[in-house]
Design a protein with these regions (language model features):
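Short, acidic/small-residue loops that bind anionic groups at enzyme active sites
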Residues: 18-35, 128-135, 180-193, 203
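Glycine-rich phosphate/diphosphate-binding loop of Rossmann-like nucleotide-binding domains
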Residues: 68-140, 152
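Flexible, glycine/charged-enriched surface loops at secondary-structure junctions
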Residues: 97-106, 129-137, 226-234, 242-254
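Glycine-rich phosphate/nucleotide-binding loop
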Residues: 146-232, 236-245
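Short, small-residue-biased leader/transition segments that mark boundaries at the very start
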Residues: 2-9
Length: 268
C-alpha cells in the first residue's frame, strides 16, 4: 500500500491515511516476533510483542495551518470513540490470545487533556478484563525500556503518533522493517501491508527482503478464515530462517529476493 503513491493528496497526507479514514481502519496491528536463526542484538531473547496503534486521528488528522508567517499550528485530535475502540481491540485480542499484560503508552504528564482522555478510555476498557494486567508508561520512558528490557513487554497500546514511532523502534529489535508485518483493521474492512517504504533505489535489483510482505499475508489469511494456509506459510517462513542458507542481504545472507522466495515455496 505504501508503494501505490508517496506524494501528498489534496486532503490527506498520503494514500495510507486516506484509506484508513475512508474504510474506518482504526486498528493498526503489528506483531513483533524474533525469527529463528536471525542474529540481532536481542537474538537470545524470545521477543513476542504485539503493538496496537490507533490509526485514524491524533496529529495524523492533517489539521495544520500557518497562523502568521513563521508560525504554524498542528492540531492533535483525540476522541473518546476512537480511543475506546483501539483499547477494546487490544484487550479483546489479548484475551483471545491469552496475553497477560497490556501497557498504555502516553504523554499525559504534559498533554493532560488529550492523552489524559486516551488513558481514561484505556482504564475503562481495562476494567472489563480483570484477568489482564494493565499498566501505563510515559512514552519517553517506554522507548528506553524497550531498548534496555524489551522482554518485559507483552501488548502495547498507543495513540497514533507514538504508535508510529514505537512500532518502528520495536521492528529494529528483531531485524528491521523488512521483517515485520502490519495490518490495518476496522469493523468491515482490513488492509494488510509491509510497513516499510518503496525503496525505489533498489527496485529490480533483487535486493529487497519480502519477509514483511509474506508475514502480512500470514495475517491476512488468518483474518479471512484460511487458518491452514496461514499456518503453512508461517511455518515455511520460519523454516527458511532457521536453516539460514537462503536469506537476503539485509539479514546477513547472500540470497536474492527470488531465491529467498523460492526457498519459502519449497517449504510450503
Amino acid at each position: 500500500m505504501t508503494g501505490v503513491q508517496t506524494c501528498a493528496l489534496p486532503i490527506y497526507q498520503s494514500i495510507n491515511v486516506a484509506l484508513r479514514k475512508k474504510l474506518g481502519l482504526y486498528t493498526n496491528f503489528r506483531p513483533v516476533r524474533m525469527l529463528p536463526g536471525l542474529k540481532t542484538r536481542y537474538h537470545d531473547l524470545a521477543l513476542d510483542l504485539a503493538i496496537f496503534r490507533e490509526n485514524t486521528e491524533d496529529l495524523y488528522s492533517g489539521l495544520e495551518h500557518e497562523v502568521v508567517p513563521g508560525v504554524v499550528e498542528s492540531l492533535k485530535i483525540i476522541t473518546e470513540k476512537a480511543s475506546t475502540k483501539i483499547a477494546r481491540s487490544a484487550f479483546e485480542w489479548s484475551h483471545r490470545e491469552r496475553r497477560k499484560k497490556v501497557v498504555a503508552i502516553h504523554k499525559a504528564n504534559i498533554m493532560k487533556l488529550s492523552d489524559g482522555l486516551f488513558l481514561k478510555c484505556c482504564r475503562e476498557v481495562a476494567s472489563h478484563f480483570p484477568g489482564i494486567a494493565y499498566s501505563e508508561l510515559i512514552v519517553d520512558n517506554a522507548c528506553m525500556q524497550l531498548v534496555m528490557r524489551p522482554e518485559t513487554f507483552d501488548v502495547l497500546l498507543l495513540p497514533n503518533l507514538y504508535g508510529d514511532i514505537i512500532s518502528d523502534l520495536a521492528a529494529g529489535l528483531v531485524g528491521g522493517l523488512g521483517i515485520v508485518p502490519g495490518a490495518n483493521i476496522g469493523d468491515h474492512h482490513a488492509i494488510f501491508e509491509a510497513v516499510h517504504g518503496t525503496a525505489p533505489d533498489i527496485a529490480g535489483k533483487g535486493l529487497a527482503n519480502p519477509t514483511a510482505l509474506m508475514q502480512s499475508a500470514v495475517l491476512m489469511l488468518a483474518h479471512i478464515g484460511e487458518r491452514e494456509a496461514s499456518v503453512r506459510l508461517h511455518n515455511a517462513i520460519y523454516q527458511t530462517y532457521a536453516e539460514r542458507d537462503c536469506l537476503t542481504g539485509d539479514v546477513g545472507g547472500m540470497a536474492s529476493t527470488n531465491e529467498f522466495t523460492d526457498a519459502v515455496i519449497r517449504h510450503l
